[in-house]
Amino acid sequence: MPKAVFGGGCFWCLDAVFRKVDGVRDVVVGYAGGRRPNPNYEQVCTGVTGHAEVVEIDYDENTVSYDELLDIFFKIHDPTQLNRQGNDVGTQYRSIILYLDEEQKEKALKKIEELKKEGLNVVTEVKPLEIFYPAEKYHQNYFAKNPHQPYCMYVVAPKVEKYLKIKNENKKT
């Protein structure tokens, strides 16, 4: 199974959205892109580890392509915000694509160039995945387990709804 690794704000949001994508087999939230080995949530939140909150997506490429995952990624977060998404501020919330091979790198850079040609000042970082550290168990599939938690209601749920609206519009065309 191929994998994709993206970061774009709180990993609960990306996790909840990508779990709704046809062809996605599993999503694991975690940390990547930094220096400290075996980081935990509290350390990552301080910003000193250099890690971003990310999702590792296990997908069936016969159902959904890496390009389609990139499209979804760029539609559900703001790639023009440096080190933040909305009220979540810090390097751990940066927009980042961690590629697993040269093909993913080329596709990510091509997509960013397309967005820049549309006038977006994309600040998404693109770098090779060195190591992915799964987050603590309580973070996994957080939205499904805590839909009435205020952050989930006011931040995560709207992103899921945005994706579902896009998905339904694409089915109509």
Curated annotation (Swiss-Prot):
Q: List the disulfide bonds.
A: none
Which GO BP terms, alphabetically? protein modification process
Q: Which UniProt keywords apply?
A: Oxidoreductase
**Catalytic reaction(s) noted:** L-methionyl-[protein] + [thioredoxin]-disulfide + H2O = L-methionyl-(S)-S-oxide-[protein] + [thioredoxin]-dithiol; [thioredoxin]-disulfide + L-methionine + H2O = L-methionine (S)-S-oxide + [thioredoxin]-dithiol
Q: Which GO terms describe its molecular function?
A: L-methionine:thioredoxin-disulfide S-oxidoreductase activity; peptide-methionine (S)-S-oxide reductase activity
Superkingdom: Bacteria
Q: Active site at which residues?
A: 10
* EC number from the UniProt entry: 1.8.4.11
Q: Which family does it belong to?
A: Belongs to the MsrA Met sulfoxide reductase family.
NCBIfam families noted in UniProt: msrA
Describe the task this protein carries out: Has an important function as a repair enzyme for proteins that have been inactivated by oxidation. Catalyzes the reversible oxidation-reduction of methionine sulfoxide in proteins to methionine.
Protein name in the entry: Peptide methionine sulfoxide reductase MsrA
Q: Which organism is it from?
A: Nautilia profundicola (strain ATCC BAA-1463 / DSM 18972 / AmH)
Q: Which gene encodes it?
A: msrA
